[in-house]
Amino acid sequence: MKIVYVNDIVYGYATGDPLAKGGAERYGWYLTRALAAAGWSVTVGVLFALREGEERVIDGVRFLGIGCRTHFLMAWLRFLKAERPDWCFWQCADALWGPAAEIAKWLGVRTAFSTMHDNDLQLRKTMSKRKHLRLPYAWGLRRSDVIFIQHYGQREYLPSHWQRKAYLLPGIFPLPDTVTPHHERTETVVWMAVIRPGKRPDLLIEIARRLPTIRFVVGGAPSLSHWDAGPIEQIMTQLRSLPNIDYRGHVAPQQALKIIGDASLFLSTSDGEGFPSVFLEAWGAGTPVVSLQIDPDHKIRDCGLGMVTETVEGTIEAVRSLMALSERRQDMGIKSRRHVGEVHSPVAAVRAFETAIASVSASWSPGRVKFPVAETHSKENL
């Protein structure tokens, strides 16, 4: 079975680029690598980081420069015609998914969309700054053969007639062989995210200010397009000036894992997510998560992987109490690693992926045309 995907940042993660960032793209790398290890033929199209026609294979995943001489959709069409995949894969809300899915269906390629945020499936909330592009994106969801969800709560956001094609695809994090015991850790609370309004860095600052004896390590660069000038300047000034905040700016992926693995707690102040990949990174490192709101499928509460606090006051109390109890953190860390190993391993994700594919393939019928031989390599037809 062959699957294709287009994403330059996935290539960045695969090559160890320290500038790579984005939970969706990091997951895209883990998933494509896991599928390749399971015997899938996986090709990731790269628009800019590789020259057109240049190839590189990393951990079984083939990266191919596809160029973008005119418009992405033309590159997509050429890519699908040349590769002849069984499936194409797409992540995150994007107006291009509508026409991209339609092109794939026309060529007889099955379509899999993977949601990476709850808002991806809430059409009245998604793409709030580009509302006029919601319709083509919604068309892409309609034309998707499979919609992968991160947690079961996301299924409820879909219209009832789309819910039957929604399948849970668990996040992936390869467990490190060893972790640092909590009694040997650095006694820090780590907060790691791209700094944008939905991550609520203002709440992080308030919590840190009210816990002056606890050290916070903060990683992440601001996403300036999401902010007005005044608020982000104030946020950054406070992050750099509070004496108990160690602000690191953008942190390379491998260094971020080390910081999380050395910390006593991971703090989430976000008010909207899907299933944060950084939760898996924390749990895999044996670091409990203290989350103000986010708790997909109630995993933190039900499995003892940290604490869900609901209020700033509750967060302050949870951080204060857990920082004083290394044995309790150690117990939570053991449960966290066990949970990741059982539910979020590459093997578990591939099993879920293939179950969904098999269910759809049994009832699937092809689109208008299946890779006409006469057109496949004809530049005149492109």
Label every PLM stretch briefly:
Residues 4, 181-199, 205-211, 217-219:
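Conserved donor-binding/catalytic core segment of Leloir-type glycosyltransferases
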Residues 93, 271:
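Aromatic "clamp/platform" in nucleotide-sugar-dependent glycosyltransferases that forms part
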Residues 106, 130-147:
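Membrane-proximal helix-turn-helix segments that form the acceptor-binding/catalytic region
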Residues 154-173:
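Helix-loop-beta element that forms the nucleotide-linked donor phosphate-binding surface
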Residues 230-251:
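Nucleotide-activated donor-binding/catalytic signature segment of Leloir-type glycosyltransferases, i.e.
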Residues 288-291:
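Short hydrophobic beta-strand element within catalytic cores of glycosyltransferases
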Residues 321, 328-343, 349-355:
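A short, well-ordered alpha-helix in the C-terminal region of glycosyltransferases
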